[in-house]
From Swiss-Prot:
GO CC annotation, single: cytoplasm
Native organism: Streptococcus pneumoniae (strain Taiwan19F-14)
Quaternary structure and interacting proteins, as annotated: Tetramer of two alpha and two beta chains.
Protein family membership: Belongs to the TrpB family.
Protein name as catalogued: Tryptophan synthase beta chain
Residues annotated as transmembrane: none
Classification via SUPFAM superfamilies: Tryptophan synthase beta subunit-like PLP-dependent enzymes
Alphabetical keyword list: Amino-acid biosynthesis, Aromatic amino acid biosynthesis, Lyase, Pyridoxal phosphate, Tryptophan biosynthesis
């Protein structure tokens, strides 16, 4: 299958596009032009590759999780260790690329939205490196959940704006960042943290994150002597770590691709963020994608234990993969993610982010189904330091509830 997406208008099949007001159209067209010029300039990629090597610490290892594999007794599990990047997650791949692009465009200020805080930290880090002013928009609820990352961003010289609109989470932070961009277009670049938003953002983010899949593909061959794994697994909120892993394999049709969505308390409740399981096409933040919405087209609140996954949409390329049945998207509950979090910590000595724990939880199920002759690559998108206090509180609360039930 020859895969050519997106087309010149930014569509991935029937998803994507550029649904923005006139005030933003100039900015996204300017961004697309600058991005195309950077792609055609070998010095841009050389500089970025050097930064990824020397500053971020790439390439990240592809690690055979022998203990986990033996514990499950199924398919071989290889972890793509994005948690070992500088700043602790995959987000730096995109942030560094976009700040470098903004610098070339002559921009002076950087703005970004963040949920779990990882994209905010990565953007603040890249802005500090390039000596640029930086403001991060973060929902007030997430500011409370991720106090440590808020302090990190401030330490790195960024200003953190707590967003009090709506449900005070990630989608509200995106709205606030877009409003700020409209008001300051001349000297400011907006760094979207996931493969979302109006074209060319989903393409730019995918391209900067595809280093994950390109490395993993070669590393798998070097490690195993085999050509391709049988499956890929990654968590999906907006979907940038997943698209980064999937895209270099999209034409390898023997490789099954699975995105683990946040099912919160369960997809039959109102508390989840399982967009491809329960959503339908709609326009959100400048792009046509699958969205959680009610019968009147109003955007529903997304919910997850993981601040990085509670977004009510998903990147348009994921909607396209789902539509053409190239990838499968599966719901994983908070409870299952917590089990994955504890299991990987216990058997491999690796504490995963709550986001990545959704991928681990599904990988455990899939490994049992596939059996020992098969193998998979799981994207460990980030480390769990930021989540340890939240997990401790949740497990203690759950234990107290169980104690009351038995009393």
């Amino acid at each position: 299958m020859a895969y050519q997406e997106p087309n010149k208008d930014g569509f991935y099949g029937k998803f994507g596009g550029r649904f923005v007001p006139e005030t933003l159209m100039t900015a996204v067209l300017e961004l697309e032009k600058a991005y195309r010029e950077s792609q055609a300039d070998p010095s841009f990629q050389e500089e970025l590759n050097q930064l990824l090597r020397q500053y971020v610490g790439r390439e990240t290892p592809l690690y055979y999780a022998k203990n986990l594999t033996q514990h499950i007794g199924g398919a071989k599990i290889y972890l793509k260790r994005e948690d070992l990047n500088h700043t602790g997650a995959h987000k730096i791949n995109n942030a560094l690329g976009q700040v470098w692009l903004a610098k070339r465009m002559g921009k002076k200020k950087i703005i970004a939205e963040t949920g779990a805080g990882q994209h905010g930290v990565a953007t603040a880090t890249a802005a500090a490196l390039f000596n640029m002013e930086c403001t991060i928009y973060m929902g007030e609820e997430d500011v409370k959940r991720q106090a440590l990352n808020v302090f990190r961003m401030e330490l790195l010289g960024a200003k953190v704006e707590a967003v009090t609109d709506g449900s005070r989470v990630l989608k509200d932070a995106v709205n606030a960042a877009l409003r700020s961009w409209v008001a300051n277009i001349d000297d400011t670049h907006y760094i979207l943290g996931s493969a979302l938003g109006p074209h060319p953002f989903p393409e730019i983010v995918r391209d900067f994150q595809s280093v994950i899949g390109r490395e993993a593909k070669q590393q798998y061959r070097d490690l195993t002597g085999q050509n391709l794994p049988d499956a890929l697994v990654a968590c999906v909120g907006g979907g940038s770590n997943a698209i980064g892993l999937f895209h270099p394999f999209v034409e390898d049709e023997s490789v099954a691709m699975y995105g683990a969505e946040a099912a919160g308390f369960g997809v039959d409740t109102e508390h989840h963020a399982a967009t491809l399981t329960k959503g339908r096409p709609g326009v959100l933040h400048g792009s046509l994608m699958d969205v959680l919405q009610d019968a009147h087209g109003q955007i529903l609140e997304a919910f997850s234990i993981s601040a990085g996954l509670d977004y009510p949409g998903i990147g348009p390329e994921h909607s396209h993969y789902h539509d053409i049945k190239r990838a499968s998207y599966v719901p994983v509950t908070d409870e299952e993610a917590l089990e994955g979090f504890q299991l990987l910590s216990r058997v491999e000595g690796i504490i995963p982010a709550l986001e990545s724990s959704h991928a681990i939880a599904f990988a455990v199920k899939l490994a049992k189904e596939l059996g020992p002759e098969k193998s998979m690559i799981v994207c460990l998108s980030g480390r769990g330091d930021k989540d340890v206090v939240q997990v401790k509180d949740r497990l203690e609360a759950d234990a107290a509830k169980k104690g009351e039930a038995h009393a």
